[in-house]
Amino acid sequence: MGPTSRNHKSSQKDVAPNEAKPPRYPQRNRSITASASASAFASPAVANSRVAKERPSSSTAGEGEPQETVLKLPSIPTLPARMAKLVPLEGLGCEAAVGSLTPSREREYKVTNKHTEGRRPVYAIVFNFLDVRYYDIFATACGPRLSTYRCLMNGKFALLQSYLDDDMNESFFTVSWACDIDGNPLLVAAGSTGIIRVINCATEKIYKSLVGHGGSVNEIKSQPSNPSLIISASKDESIKLWNVQTGILILVFGGVGGHRHEVLGVDFHTSDIYRFLSCGMDNTVRIWSMKEFWEYVEKSYSWTDATSKFPTKFVQFPVLCAEIHSNYVDCTKWLGDFVLSKSVENEILLWESITKEENPGEGHIDVLQKYPVPECNIWFMKFSCDFHHNQLAIGNRDGKVYVWKVQTSPPVLIARLNNPQVKSAIRQTAVSFDGSTILACTEDGNIWRWDEVDHPTAPVPSKKQK
């Protein structure tokens, strides 16, 4: 079967992403083994609601006659006016600025290191931007293994810690950084089993195991201003907000106005603590708000009863649903109040939503810029930005990395990174704090590092030399 634009990523060993079938995900709570042995703490799973079946009373049925079973279906509420379903404007004057694929060479990079994680795909790689002490530390997810490294000045890596799940069939798809109440770094990861592992890197022990999703978890993000809050995007079509400090499931986003297929990506707003983005296989990008339910977020910190008794709330309607792509949307990020989103259409879009104040349910999408990415037509290929969102790096299926200058119009391609030895699809990139180092993880189990080339400045001649 040839590759198509709607391929499933592989979660099985030695299976190509375009040929893999979606695995079944058993709901078992497995422990994970750290470099120092520790026990896992599992929060109880959220019970699935069942549709009740009621029989008519004996007074309404004749004696000896078979009684009918009446199935009561829940009523579906209408979409509220506050939810805007927007599409892009088309026509003269609505054209987006498209970047050129000719590199400007504003910054030049060279390959400085290659590290082999294993034989299974490395699906995730991310720097720790939550604490200035750890800006040069990054984490990776490869099969059932999580690893943390430090970027050294000579272009090399220093392995700090490594964690191995007891279930060797686990395949971690996402990894993120969080913090506990004392500021210790927490490593948060999840994958095919749907169980979220929270590891305290300072104590080298399991901090929490969060159970609640009914399918694999595709992405986890922590809130920049409150890193003990995380959101998780799942195959079960829902997004969940967790407090990793207490292990409480606070909010569940999904339902009538939620995603209609697997959720692939999420991202917290950098300055608005209430809003976040989500995207998925239903070709949409949605903006959600937690403002009306923030009291439950605050309550989750002081909750002393069992986590299963916490009054978890369900949020069914997003603020906005953007139908801007015609295929799977696997990555999205905020750029201020603008949105960057990527589908399997060989480009990244920068857009904003325009709604009417008198009628928030009406409006349109204004596509501002397009960042072309050739040979990027398979899903689960995620881009990343530096700390200040000045530049963006995205890999493709041929092993090339495109580095774009984000905050210019039209977009400027800073560099195109390639190496003859990189022949596998790049699943995710990681850009360092200042953009001087770019990392990429590949389908064949490798991590590649590019570092900026320093060009010595020519000395200014003195008056005597003149």
Swiss-Prot record:
Expressed specifically in seed endosperm. Disulfide bonds: none annotated. The keyword Ion transport does not apply. Residues 31-49 have a biased composition (Low complexity). Residues 1-10 have a biased composition (Basic residues). It holds the Pfam family WD40. GO terms for biological process: cell differentiation; embryo development ending in seed dormancy; endosperm development; flower development; heterochromatin formation; negative regulation of transcription by RNA polymerase II; seed development. Residues 1-71 are annotated as: Disordered. WD repeats lie at residues 167-209, 212-252, 258-298, 324-361, 374-414, 421-460. It comes from the Eukaryota. Signal peptide: none annotated. Polycomb group (PcG) protein. PcG proteins act by forming multiprotein complexes, which are required to maintain the transcriptionally repressive state of homeotic genes throughout development. PcG proteins are not required to initiate repression, but to maintain it during later stages of development. They act via the methylation of histones, rendering chromatin heritably changed in its expressibility. Together with EZ1 and CLF forms a complex that is involved in gene transcriptional repression by trimethylation on histone H3 'Lys-27' (H3K27me3) of target genes. The FIE1 locus is imprinted. Maternal inherited gene is expressed in the ovule (the egg and the central cell), while the paternal inherited gene is silenced in the pollen. After fertilization, only the maternal inherited allele is expressed. The gain-of-function epi-allele (Epi-df) plants exhibit dwarf phenotype, defect in flower development and very poor seed set. Plants silencing FIE1 have delayed embryo development, reduced seed set, and reduced grain length, width and weight. This is Polycomb group protein FIE1. The gene is FIE1.
